[in-house]
Amino acid sequence: MGASGPSGVAVVAFAVPAKVPLYLETAGQDPGIAEEGDAVGLQIIDSGTGKSFFFIPGCAVMTDPLRRRLTGSELVFFDGTLWRDDEMIRLGVGNKTGRRMGHISMSGDDGAIAGFRDLGVKRRIFIHINNSNPVLLDDSPERQLAEAAGWEIAYDGMEVRL
């Protein structure tokens, strides 16, 4: 409900693949990835038109159930934390891989770009981008690769219309 009645927007929350939160990890053990983990994605639906989009700021891996959910979507905002899994280690700014932190990489055979390749999603926008990610640089080869694959890179003040 909005302040003056129904908002005309419905929100459906659903589990996305994730690792367990740090406070639930067992010391010295790989926490692994759960297909229905402790992270959520949202489908936001305009009740009047039926148009919708997905908002998934954190996702550990692309799974078949997630592929089925997103196939043919008009718009997906998706986890773009890292370009490559070992990015923070290679740059000397962290000691964990993206996977260890519960984030799928943009690139690679198991990355988001490859994972969305055959889903028929009309518009794909990377969000939640770490400051170590070279895709943030307009003239980087990584940015060119992402855009050539049909992805947009979110930016402060970006407005999106369905």
What positions do the PLM features span?
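Core dinuclear metal-dependent hydrolase active-site scaffold
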Residues: 1-69, 156-162
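Cap/insert and terminal regions of metallo-dependent hydrolase folds
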Residues: 37-39, 48-52, 60-158
